[in-house]
């Protein structure tokens, strides 16, 4: 149980730090005016690998795949900045994934509204 609690605390701390890094320290002009939110972080058992789920609100004509590619290409720099801000023996390798839960939730809400109001 203690291992799970530690894993939860570390993943939350990594989530906070990566959110801050993406928002304030990642200076890629292609990511300006794009809201990137870190939804969750899944760590491997030995904390050497982290899967980061991001939600993206896009005002530009950039696809989700392009944004994820930009983040993945910047993952070494993000990992370096993460190592400066968090004190762990092993800083995990970062892998970014698109979190589609917001889009799926919106679709389900629209379907429910259509059923309820279009009788």
From Swiss-Prot:
SUPFAM superfamilies: Ribosome-binding factor A, RbfA. GO terms for cellular component: cytosol. It is found in: Cytoplasm. PROSITE patterns: RBFA. Keywords: Cytoplasm, Ribosome biogenesis. Its main location: cytoplasm. It holds the Pfam family RBFA. Coiled coil: none annotated. The keyword Cytoplasm applies. One of its GO terms (biological process) is maturation of SSU-rRNA. GO terms for molecular function: ribosomal small subunit binding. InterPro entries: KH_dom-like_a/b, RbfA, RbfA_dom_sf, Ribosome-bd_factorA_CS. Monomer. Binds 30S ribosomal subunits, but not 50S ribosomal subunits or 70S ribosomes. One of several proteins that assist in the late maturation steps of the functional core of the 30S ribosomal subunit. Associates with free 30S ribosomal subunits (but not with 30S subunits that are part of 70S ribosomes or polysomes). Required for efficient processing of 16S rRNA. May interact with the 5'-terminal helix region of 16S rRNA. Belongs to the RbfA family. PANTHER family: RIBOSOME-BINDING FACTOR A, CHLOROPLASTIC-RELATED. This is Ribosome-binding factor A. The lineage of its organism: Bacteria, Pseudomonadati, Pseudomonadota, Gammaproteobacteria, Enterobacterales.
